[in-house]
């Protein structure tokens, strides 16, 4: 099992698919990485040489923000919005949907379990 960016990637999968197990690398970035390292798209992780794994690590470290660094960056951005007091920051602070979704009904995932109100029946 190869370890890239602090993640154990599965050995029996194709390299393009296995790289997507790293937070911050999707289909497009995985395809770009194997193109830069010049690895065939149908190659499996178990067939990679140590040199190829090292090249993949170097490309990811140099060109991409992944795993903990990416999570930290996103957290800092959200905190910045909350400190500014802008609308998006207020929505984050209140635990409500940020991108304009309705909240009269739905939005239960973001708002948490329904709170019952005593004496409210039809």
Curated annotation (Swiss-Prot):
Entry-linked InterPro entries: Rbsml_uS13_C, Ribosomal_uS13, Ribosomal_uS13-like_H2TH, Ribosomal_uS13_bac-type, Ribosomal_uS13_CS
UniProt-listed Pfam families: Ribosomal_S13
GO terms assigned for molecular function: rRNA binding; structural constituent of ribosome; tRNA binding
Keyword DNA-binding: no
Gene3D superfamilies cross-referenced by the UniProt entry: 1.10.8.50, 30s ribosomal protein s13, domain 2
Gene Ontology biological-process annotations: translation
Keyword list, A-Z: Ribonucleoprotein, Ribosomal protein, RNA-binding, rRNA-binding, tRNA-binding
Cellular component, GO annotation: cytosol; small ribosomal subunit
SUPFAM superfamilies listed in its UniProt record: S13-like H2TH domain (SSF46946)
PROSITE patterns tied to this protein: RIBOSOMAL_S13_1 (PS00646), RIBOSOMAL_S13_2 (PS50159)
Region (Disordered): 95-122
Superkingdom in the source lineage: Bacteria
Keyword Metal-binding: no
Function: Located at the top of the head of the 30S subunit, it contacts several helices of the 16S rRNA. In the 70S ribosome it contacts the 23S rRNA (bridge B1a) and protein L5 of the 50S subunit (bridge B1b), connecting the 2 subunits; these bridges are implicated in subunit movement. Contacts the tRNAs in the A and P-sites.
PANTHER family: 30S RIBOSOMAL PROTEIN S13/40S RIBOSOMAL PROTEIN S18 (PTHR10871), SMALL RIBOSOMAL SUBUNIT PROTEIN US13M (PTHR10871:SF1)
NCBIfam families xrefs: uS13_bact
Family: Belongs to the universal ribosomal protein uS13 family.
Subunit structure: Part of the 30S ribosomal subunit. Forms a loose heterodimer with protein S19. Forms two bridges to the 50S subunit in the 70S ribosome.
Designated name of the protein: Small ribosomal subunit protein uS13
Organism: Nitrobacter winogradskyi (strain ATCC 25391 / DSM 10237 / CIP 104748 / NCIMB 11846 / Nb-255)
């Amino acid at each position: 099992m190869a370890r890239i960016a602090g993640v154990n990637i599965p050995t029996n999968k194709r390299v393009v698919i296995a790289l997507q197990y790293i937070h911050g690398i999707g289909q497009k970035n995985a395809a770009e990485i194997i193109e830069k390292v010049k690895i065939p798209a149908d190659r499996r992780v178990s067939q990679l040489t140590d040199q190829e794994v090292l090249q993949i690590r170097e490309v990811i470290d140099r060109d991409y923000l992944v795993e903990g660094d990416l999570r930290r960056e996103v957290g800092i951005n959200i905190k910045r919005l909350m400190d500014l007091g802008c609308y998006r920051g207020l929505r984050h602070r209140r635990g409500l949907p940020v991108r304009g979704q309705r909240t009269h009904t739905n939005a239960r995932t973001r708002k948490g379990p329904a709170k019952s109100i005593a004496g409210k029946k039809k």
